Amino acid sequence: MGKQGLNIGLIGTGNMGGEIARIAPEKGHNIVAAFNRNRPLSEDSFNEEIDVCIDFSCPECVVNNVCMLANWGVPLVLGTTGWTARFAEVRAQVISSEMAIVHAPNFSIGVAVYLRIVREAGTLFNQLPDYDVFVHESHHRRKVDSPSGTALAL
């Protein structure tokens, strides 16, 4: 990357996509293409300027997006949740194409630390048969996936 930022293809222009579009230029990166339900990723939408795609779209779109980007040789940061029922299919595509991909249910450093703490707590609670652990989450009314990918990771 050096001093020049990345040229980003943004897949999904909802809440997270909007935040990425807002923050990327502040960090020196360029949004060179944006895809959404009205303008989905397709063979006709290839843009050779794209260095990496960031996907916060919908679970139903993930397999198509991964296949398309693998064919183009474009790395992917995947933040979309709710698609893991098709994990084996995505994994096979990634392996066969040697695609570069990073995926997580949540990219927050705070959540990453919290997940590690929860793992440790789980080990301790497993030794206490009188305790049942559960997760309760609440969100704004427009939250699309419930339970969230973060809650499922916990």
What are these regions (language model features)?
Residues T80-H103, A112-A121:
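Rossmann-fold NAD(P)-binding glycine/threonine-rich loop
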Residues F46, V52, F56-T80, F87-Q93:
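Rossmann-fold NAD(P) dinucleotide-binding segment
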Residues L10, I31-R37, C53-D55:
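Short, hydrophobic beta-strand segments that form beta-sheet elements in well-ordered domains
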Residues E19, I23-E43:
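NAD(P)-binding Rossmann-fold cofactor-contacting core
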Residues N36-P40, T80-T84, F107:
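Short, acidic/turn-prone active-site loops that include or flank metal/cofactor-
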Residues N7-I20, G110:
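Glycine-rich adenosine-cofactor-binding loop
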Residues P75, V90-S108, L128-V135:
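Rossmann-fold dehydrogenase core element
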Residues V113-L154:
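Conserved anion/nucleotide-ligand pocket segment
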